[in-house]
Curated annotation (Swiss-Prot):
It comes from Colobus guereza. This is Progesterone receptor. SMART domains: HOLI, ZnF_C4. There is a cross-link at K388 (Glycyl lysine isopeptide (Lys-Gly) (interchain with G-Cter in ubiquitin)). Belongs to the nuclear hormone receptor family. The keyword Zinc applies. A motif (LXXL motif 2) lies at residues 115-119. A motif (Nuclear localization signal) lies at residues 183-187. Phosphorylated on multiple serine sites. Several of these sites are hormone-dependent. Phosphorylation on Ser-294 is highly hormone-dependent and modulates ubiquitination and sumoylation on Lys-388. Phosphorylation on Ser-345 also requires induction by hormone. Basal phosphorylation on Ser-81, Ser-162, Ser-190 and Ser-400 is increased in response to progesterone and can be phosphorylated in vitro by the CDK2-A1 complex. Increased levels of phosphorylation on Ser-400 also in the presence of EGF, heregulin, IGF, PMA and FBS. Residues 680-914 form the NR LBD domain. The lineage of its organism: Eukaryota, Metazoa, Chordata, Craniata, Vertebrata. It is found in: Nucleus; Cytoplasm. It comes from the Eukaryota. Composed of three domains: a modulating N-terminal domain, a DNA-binding domain and a C-terminal ligand-binding domain. Residues 1-164 are annotated as: AF3.
Length: 934
């Protein structure tokens, strides 16, 4: 007959008296030999937790006398305990028959009714019914002898259970539930693998961080007849809840029945599954092994309490959207490939796990969450400015610019799972960090991956996919020519480079730039058969840029031979010929001649965006003249009559001719083009500068309402809207900049973030210099501030600071070629203190544009002395811009911080750049590159 022994300050139990209501009292039974009781003698009695018996309605285990009742059901289960070859196999047999509840007996035999059925380990290969509880007293080793810090002589049971059982009476509510939970141990695990999360009072094992105390658990109880549930298979036991611990809040507290003591084992109805939200249940029955998972993975996943990280509403909405948009999400091949187990797992060759199971969200054995546990939902960090690599191929055009999630379940959605073979892509610049080659070779549909975290609006705009036409070479996709489709434009990324990274791709023919049309109209074509014959030895990589006459009809550009209809590029009427360098009608020809010779000062009554067509071309002469100038009409174009037809076409199509991406050297003279300006003779423009002219952004409007009186908030809001549009323009311009895409992606991000303010104020100075001769600040055609409006604004001192730039342009008489080269150098004028990842490529690119600036100076300055003086003046202006822009950064950051009080709106992408980079710049965490010492 076993006795109930008191422990610590508790009162001793009197035989024959009522049972002690203390929870956690030790039960002393006859010891039994076990594999985990190496140094435990027969006199040492294990301690186990007791079930509180002071309340009615609790589940009592079977009596310890005699054999099992005939109506009870015994279940046996084998599990593997051979973990990493360190331990031998062991079988655990436990009777888990459902015991019906009955009221407690009021006699001395009541003690027998509270004894639990303990697991009696047997030899391998044996399976027998469980003996009575009074005969099996082998204790459970919670953590097993595998703890390295435990001395081998001390039993693991005593070291682990003693701190769990030595609780003060005042903490019964917190410890009773944990002690009761230790009574119901997971079946299918060997004692050495029964890893239970430590409570707040238990010591942690080595290497495991401290975690909050687990929630109380309620143990699932079968029906009285002991029948098993038919749908109980699976690793997640269909939401059966458990509660571990004392005062549980929320659904955990509701799961405990009223009649159960605090921390006791309560009954939870099987149909009430609403309490099972994020927890894994423990069941008193055998759980079948989940398909596609090994026994070890199943047991470890089913019975370890996993604190799943809660997902916010945005992540849940993204997951729902991904499931809804997946067309193949019906358990077919799409679902099988998306949820395939890892190749390194023991069950890689088994059936895929169920869709509802998320094994990658669990903590690994070292209790640390995986870095890529939630690959589909993006980063939990604040939005960072990341630039993704642009997808290649025609299928990238179907991707939405604003989508950050893959539209369906694909093998790349979960980076832990095996990825399908990626398609071959054209070679790109080699990454400077190891392990990034696989990221750049990811398929177009896998834009969201663990190596490239999701980014912001700037990321989506910077390298969004463009419609791509097939390339000529081994990476060429199928042809995409369609009848009446015009022509296909190829991305700029396909252009060759003279750098070492592009030398390997010289065998594949390069692609073309998109036609840089004006006002949406294509440029004129040209005949290049003669020029192509002369470039056989000089430009072998660039021969596909030059089209023979036979290809003129297939080109989307116009040419005189294959022009289906001669259309005026100004008004759309039938063109009578090439007048002043542009294919126009007779009306626009006469209008342009009279307007330029008469020096009329036309003003638009609208917003400088009037429609100029055949019917309305006479409504607004200002917009008509502006369109003529934008199309390239110049009075000097009459000198074309002195040349033959081939040279005329070459000169007219200079902008439309694609230029090499690589920086040309001095020997590349054949690719130079002729340009003309009024009052000047023909001059040669270096090809790179000519390319910079062709990629210059169009006119950007601020959208300011000039009909209303100016207020501080309205002016600042309009300037912010203009800054957002100009930032987008800077991003697109940098994409087309030769040599910029050879830099590392992070370097491209950094350079844009550090220089966007300098580029904007430099463009403001150029527009003010060209349009109003530096007398006003020409922010946009619809936002021009004269001195009176500057004084009325709240940022008059800032306007005076910005006004210095156009005044310097007027003083130095800066040419357009010089301005374009200086603008690129501004982009490359500020780097981080630690340098860039592709520092070598950056220095080569910067040196090349410095040489281009010297060439631009040589177009106007003759002589070494004058050219050197001019170079000093222009570079000194670039150095002085650092201090000027710093004042703009400080004012912009202060306005951004007080934007709510000032009623000033900041657009999204501009806000991201200001919040992420301006504090670093103002704190001196950047390194300005100066031409001259101060």
């Amino acid at each position: 007959m076993t006795e109930l022994k008191s422990k610590g300050p508790r009162a001793p139990h009197v035989a024959g008296g009522p049972p002690s209501p203390e929870v956690g009292s030790p039960l002393l039974c006859r010891p039994a030999a076990g594999p985990f009781q190496g140094s435990q003698t027969s006199d040492t009695l294990p301690e186990v937790s007791a079930i509180p018996i002071s309340l009615d309605g609790l589940l009592f285990p079977r009596l310890c006398q005699g054999q099992d009742p005939p109506d009870k059901k015994t279940q046996n289960q084998q599990s593997l305990s051979d973990v990493e070859g360190a331990y031998s196999r062991a079988e655990a047999t436990r009777g888990t028959g459902g015991s019906s509840s009955r009221p407690p007996e009021k006699d001395s035999g009541l003690l027998d009714s509270v004894l639990d059925t303990l697991l009696a380990p047997s030899g391998p290969g044996q399976s027998q019914p469980s003996p009575p509880a009074c005969e099996v007293t082998s204790s459970w080793c919670l953590f097993g002898p595998e703890l390295p810090e435990d001395p081998p002589a001390a039993p693991a049971t005593q070291r682990v259970l003693s701190p769990l059982m030595s609780r003060s009476g005042g903490k019964t509510e917190d410890s009773s539930g944990t002690a009761a939970a230790h009574k119901v141990l997971p079946r299918g695990l060997s004692p050495s693998r029964q890893l239970l999360l430590p409570t707040s009072g238990s010591p942690h094992w080595s290497g495991a961080p401290v975690k909050p105390s687990p929630q109380p658990t309620a143990v699932e109880v079968e029906e009285e007849d002991g029948s098993e549930s038919e749908d109980s298979a699976g690793p997640l036991l269909k939401g059966k809840s458990r509660v571990l611990g004392g005062a549980a809040a929320g659904g955990g507290a509701a799961a405990v029945p009223p009649g159960a003591a605090a921390g006791g084992v309560g009954l939870v109805p099987k149909e009430d599954s609403r309490f099972s939200a994020p927890r894994v249940a423990l069941v008193e029955q055998d759980a079948p092994m989940a398909p596609g998972r090994s026994p070890l993975a199943t047991t470890m996943m089913d019975f370890i309490h996993v604190p799943i990280v809660p997902l916010n509403h945005a992540l849940l909405a993204a997951r729902t959207r991904q499931l809804l948009e997946d067309e193949s999400y019906d358990g077919g091949a799409g679902a099988a490939s998306a949820f395939a187990p890892p190749q390194s797992s023991p069950s890689a060759s088994s059936t895929p796990v169920a869709v509802g199971d998320f094994p990658d969200c669990a903590y690994p054995p070292d209790a640390e969450p995986k870095d890529n546990a939630y690959p589909l939902y993006g980063d939990f960090q604040p939005l960072a400015l990341k630039i993704k690599e642009e997808e290649e191929g025609a299928e990238a055009s179907a991707r939405s610019p604003g989508s950050y999630l893959v539209a369906g379940a694909n093998p790349a959605a979960f980076p832990d799972f095996p990825l399908g073979p990626p398609p071959q892509l054209p070679p790109r610049a080699p990454p400077s960090r190891p392990g990034e080659a696989a990221v750049t070779a990811a398929p177009a549909s896998a834009s969201v991956s663990s190596a490239s975290s999701p980014g912001s609006t700037l990321e989506c705009i910077l390298y969004k996919a463009e419609g791509a036409l097939p390339q000529q070479g081994q990476f060429a996709p199928p042809p995409c020519k369609a009848p009446g489709a015009g022509g296909c434009l190829l991305p700029r990324d396909g252009l060759p480079s003279t750098s070492a990274s592009a030398a390997a791709a010289a065998g594949a023919a390069p692609t073309l730039y998109p036609a840089l049309g004006l006002n949406g109209l294509p440029q004129l074509g040209y005949q290049a058969a003669v020029l192509k014959e002369g470039l056989q030895q000089v430009y072998p990589p660039y021969l596909n840029y030059l089209r023979p006459d036979s290809e003129a009809s297939q080109s989307p550009q116009y040419s005189f031979e294959s022009l289906p209809q001669k259309i005026c590029l100004i008004c759309g009427d039938e063109a009578s010929g090439c007048h002043y360098g542009v294919l126009t009608c007779g009306s626009c020809k006469v209008f342009f001649k009279r307007a330029m010779e008469g020096q009329h000062n036309y003003l638009c009554a609208g917003r400088n965006d009037c429609i100029v067509d055949k019917i309305r071309r006479k409504n607004c002469p200002a917009c008509r003249l502006r369109k003529c100038c934008q199309a390239g009409m110049v009075l000097g174009g009459r000198k074309f009559k002195k040349f033959n037809k081939v040279r005329v076409m070459r000169a007219l199509d200079a902008v439309a001719l694609p230029q090499p991406v690589g920086i040309p050297n001095e020997s590349q003279v054949l690719s130079q083009r002729f340009t003309f300006s009024p009052g000047q003779d023909i001059q040669l423009i270096p090809p790179l500068i000519k390319l910079l002219m062709s990629i210059e952004p169009d006119v950007i409007y601020a959208g300011h309402d000039n009909s209303k009186p100016d207020t501080s908030s309205s002016l600042l809001t309009s300037l912010n809207q203009l800054g957002e549009r100009q930032l987008l323009s800077v991003v697109k311009w940098s994409k087309s900049l030769p040599g910029f895409r050879n830099l590392h992606i992070d370097d491209q991000i950094t350079l844009i973030q550090y220089s966007w303010m300098s580029l904007m104020v430099f463009g403001l100075g150029w527009r003010s210099y060209k349009h109003v001769s530096g007398q006003m600040l020409y922010f946009a055609p619809d936002l021009i501030l004269n001195e009176q409006r500057m004084k009325e604004s709240s940022f008059y001192s800032l306007c005076l600071t910005m006004w210095q730039i156009p005044q310097e342009f007027v003083k130095l008489q800066v040419s357009q070629e010089e301005f374009l080269c200086m603008k690129v150098l501004l982009l490359l004028n500020t780097i981080p203190l630690e340098g860039l990842r592709s520092q070598t490529q950056f220095e080569e690119m910067r040196s090349s544009y410095i040489r281009e600036l010297i060439k631009a100076i040589g177009l106007r300055q003759k002589g070494v002395v004058s050219s050197s003086q001019r170079f000093y003046q222009l570079t000194k202006l670039l150095d002085n811009l650092h201090d000027l822009v710093k004042q703009l950064h400080l004012y912009c950051l202060n306005t951004f911080i007080q934007s709510r009080a000032l009623s000033v709106e900041f657009p999204e992408m501009m806000s991201e750049v200001i919040a992420a980079q301006l504090p670093k710049i103002l704190a001196g965490m950047v390194k300005p590159l100066l031409f001259h010492k101060k």
